[in-house]
Amino acid sequence: MTVFESLMNKLTEKGALHFSLLDPDKVTMDKFIELAKGAEKAGSDALMIGGSYGVNEGTLDNYIDAVKQEVKLPIILFPGSVAGLSRRADAVLFLSVLNSTDPYYIIGAQVQAAVLMAKHYSNLESIPMAYIIVGEGGAVGFASYAKPIPFHMEDVIVAYALAAYYMGFSAIYLEAGSGAREPVPSSVVAKVKRAVRNKILMVGGGIKSPEAAYSIALAGADVIITGTVIEESPAVVLKDIVDAVHRGGLRRLSNSNENANAWVNDK
């Protein structure tokens, strides 16, 4: 079973998943291992590893090898450049920054990475992902020369998500930016999810409280990603956020089942 299939099975059970994002460039290896173990203990469903700057294959290999000795969660690469690949990982988010103003981040880096994948990283499972940077955008917005879409321009965000849907991406990621002051609004999440239907909707950036996590999961996010809160907050905060993601997902599943039953009863 592939990583994607395994996560889809979990999604069917839980309604929403939580991924912990860890950046090897920001912490020592010992701290990195500590954070990974904390994420697993908190109930996170997968580890995303990567960053906007400064990560290379050698560093990734060492960090991933160390983490794999301590945790059993799937490790998914979230590369900020073609240097962010590692044979030690289980899968990679093969992403395109749809609203970058530089073609390199839309297709150029992907062409380079594709050749590397075919020649040297054939063991890595590829998960095609459309990356749409919204709100403040954070460091990744600067690094990828993106033009972040303001939250109030909901129709524009939906239009980009629809483009990803019709282009056949498996997953669509709405990114508000690492450490953003506000997360993607639930109203935006709900509209995008209605538009992209069965595609995996990922949401990250600025999610610092259980209340925000629950609201976003309930609105339609299939996967919620937190990174900064893992590095800056006590482990209990992460557990509360993970629990809130799963509660929101289960509530959404329950609502869907109730609506389906009501439709059947009306017939």
Swiss-Prot record:
Keywords recorded for this protein, A-Z: Cytoplasm, Lipid biosynthesis, Lipid metabolism, Magnesium, Metal-binding, Phospholipid biosynthesis, Phospholipid metabolism, Transferase
EC assignment: 2.5.1.41
InterPro entries: GGGP/HepGP_synthase_I, GGGP/HepGP_synthase_sf, GGGP_HepGP_synthase, GGGP_synth
Listed SUPFAM superfamilies: FMN-linked oxidoreductases
GO biological process: glycerophospholipid biosynthetic process
Alphabetized CDD domains for the sequence: PcrB_like
Compartments it resides in: Cytoplasm
Ligand binding (sn-glycerol 1-phosphate): Y173, L174, E175, A176, G177, S178, G179, G205, G206, G227, T228
Main localization (coarse): cytoplasm
Associated pathway: Membrane lipid metabolism; glycerophospholipid metabolism
Record-listed Mg(2+) binding positions: D23, S52
Substrates-to-products reaction catalysed: sn-glycerol 1-phosphate + (2E,6E,10E)-geranylgeranyl diphosphate = sn-3-O-(geranylgeranyl)glycerol 1-phosphate + diphosphate
GO cellular component term of the entry, any: cytoplasm
GO molecular function term, any single one: magnesium ion binding
Stated role: Prenyltransferase that catalyzes the transfer of the geranylgeranyl moiety of geranylgeranyl diphosphate (GGPP) to the C3 hydroxyl of sn-glycerol-1-phosphate (G1P). This reaction is the first ether-bond-formation step in the biosynthesis of archaeal membrane lipids.
Family from the record: Belongs to the GGGP/HepGP synthase family. Group II subfamily.
PANTHER family noted in UniProt: HEPTAPRENYLGLYCERYL PHOSPHATE SYNTHASE, PTHR40029
Name the record gives this protein: Geranylgeranylglyceryl phosphate synthase
Organism: Caldivirga maquilingensis (strain ATCC 700844 / DSM 13496 / JCM 10307 / IC-167)
UniProt lineage: Archaea, Thermoproteota, Thermoprotei, Thermoproteales, Thermoproteaceae
